[in-house]
Curated annotation (Swiss-Prot):
High-level lineage: Bacteria, Pseudomonadati, Pseudomonadota, Gammaproteobacteria, Alteromonadales
Species of the source: Shewanella putrefaciens (strain CN-32 / ATCC BAA-453)
An annotated Gene Ontology molecular function: succinylglutamate-semialdehyde dehydrogenase activity
Pathway per the UniProt entry: Amino-acid degradation; L-arginine degradation via AST pathway; L-glutamate and succinate from L-arginine: step 4/5
The protein, known as: N-succinylglutamate 5-semialdehyde dehydrogenase
Gene label: astD
One biological process term in Gene Ontology: arginine catabolic process to glutamate
Tagged with keyword NAD: yes
PROSITE patterns xref list: ALDEHYDE_DEHYDR_CYS, ALDEHYDE_DEHYDR_GLU
Length: 486
């Protein structure tokens, strides 16, 4: 059974789809896509369930969401293994993803009250009350790189606010989505409150274009996000939250502990095989002996990164990319940069045919006058040597994206200078730029988003404010307005 609609599992009426373990090419899931008719049934189920779900009240909704957290705790080993099998990420990393899913419950409950709670104040005109109400029926489109944590970051706050959800996961990670929804079912979520439709582009289009959804929350590529933005033009009544990619810069300046700096570079560029939207894509290192020493250490460290299957022992740092197609795409990206004048310092290679296993790459692109402003979504880091700090910041800002950026520097003054000038929604100092806090907003500017930050601020796009002026009874004012008599 592939789809979960109105509290029941259904076989799809579309074409066959499979999910492949990218580390060995084995099929680990198969099903049939949802047709437009099945998507419509899911939307109707969500619509029918929405008002009753809202009227349960926050405390009752929270109790069910906390029951889901208990299910995550009880099934965390199975969920972590499923994520590892389907994405190719090593088990140590998928265990941290499940931990983030569990932690999201308390953070989302806190965010609900802080960002969208109820506030009342007595004023001369009456009691002024600010409340928040759910949008209604929302679609959640999940990505493949964090198939549990990232859609979870939309679904949990949406449900807490009183919305109902149609979840359309990446077609590359359907098994993770199926397990997540089974845990929601075990938690006692009422029928129709969450619905799962699996499929590819046609399924996604049917859901995104459905006239009865009130909002769409998307995490994925900038290209798809821009298409959704165009589609929603002229529909101001629908809320659209886009969390997209980045061509993220990391600048190194005056760091004495170059070993620590190299560690932060590795964690920024190569974790998750470079498949995080916040991964460093461009590295700016000072010209001179100190920069030379750092690069020499970095080259050696990149060459020593362990790559292997998700379940290899001892565990690798990098697992497989999501697919062989993705791996070949990174080889092609490297070749393109070489054609433009780049110089390989560590070659990215496709390690095994039929898999997504690649080695990490490092390429010096200083000689390229105009770098392609592309998000190469994999373990390929572009190095640029710079002369002065202003030049580095100027180059770092030469991107249409604006998701994450970072500075490794011993000087607080340098960081303050950088912070004032860099254009990004996540700006870190002396920390990996893939590091983000669930207690803070997560999002970018430019081609990285549409000013709908997620994580702690996800509550903002899950509800709308309702302002009221209230009194317990109708009463005449002490003085009537001019021209009135009663």
């Amino acid at each position: 059974m592939t789809h979960y609609i109105q509290g029941q599992w259904h076989t799809g009426n579309g074409h066959d789809v499979t999910s492949i373990n990218p580390a060995n090419g084995e099929t680990i899931w198969c099903g049939k896509t949802a047709t437009a008719e099945q998507v419509n049934t899911a939307v109707e189920a969500a619509r029918a369930a929405q008002f009753d779900w809202f009227m349960l009240g926050f405390d009752a909704r929270l109790a069910i969401v906390e029951a889901y957290r208990s299910q995550l705790e009880a099934n965390k080993a199975e969920l972590a293994e499923t994520i590892a099998q389907e994405t190719g990420k090593p088990q140590w990393e998928t265990a941290t993803e499940v931990g983030a899913m569990i932690g999201k419950i308390a953070l989302s409950a806190a965010a609900y009250h802080k960002r969208t709670g109820t506030e009342a104040n007595d004023t001369p005109a009456g009691r002024a009350v600010i409340r928040h109400k759910p949008h209604g029926v929302v679609a959640v489109f999940g990505p493949y790189n964090f198939p549990g944590h990232l859609p979870n970051g939309h679904i949990v706050p949406a449900l807490l606010a009183g919305n109902t959800v149609i979840f359309k996961p990446s077609e590359l990670t359907p098994k993770v989505a199926e397990l997540m929804v089974k845990l929601w079912d075990k938690a006692g979520l009422p029928a129709g409150v969450i619905n799962l439709v699996q499929g590819e582009v046609d399924t996604g289009k049917a859901l995104a274009s459905h006239p009865q959804i009130d909002g769409l929350f998307f995490t994925g590529s900038s290209r798809t996000g821009h298409l959704l933005h165009q589609q929603y033009a002229g529909h101001p009544g629908k809320i659209l939250a886009l969390e997209m990619g980045g061509n993220n810069p990391l600048i190194i300046k005056g760091v004495q502990d170059i070993k620590a700096a190299v560690h932060d570079i590795l964690q920024s560029a190569y974790i998750s095989s470079g498949q995080r939207c916040t991964c460093a894509r461009r590295l700016y290192v000072e010209q001179g002996e100190q920069g030379d020493a750092l690069i020499a250490l970095l080259v050696d460290a990149v060459k020593q990164i362990k790559v292997g299957p998700w379940n290899a022992q001892p565990q690798p740092f990098m697992g497989s990319m999501i697919s062989e197609t993705a791996a070949k795409g990174m080889v092609a990206a490297q070749a393109n940069l070489l054609d433009l004048g780049g110089k390989v310092l560590v070659e990215l290679t496709h390690l095994q045919a039929g898999t997504g296993l690649v080695s990490p790459g490092l390429i010096d692109v200083t000689a390229i006058d105009v770098l392609p402003d592309e998000e190469y979504f994999g373990p390929l880091l572009q190095l640029v040597r710079y002369g002065d700090f202003d030049q580095a910041i100027k180059l770092a800002n030469q991107t249409r994206y604006g998701l994450s950026a970072g500075l490794l520097a011993d000087s607080r003054e340098d960081y303050d200078y950088f912070l004032a000038r860099i254009r990004a929604g996540i700006v870190n100092w002396n920390k990996q730029i893939t590091g983000a806090s669930g207690a803070a907003p997560f999002g970018g500017v430019g081609a990285s988003g549409n000013h709908r930050a997620s994580a702690f601020y996800a509550a903002d796009y899950c509800a709308y404010p309702v302002a009221s002026v209230e009194a317990d009874a109708v009463s005449l004012p002490a003085t009537l307005s001019p021209g009135l008599s009663l």
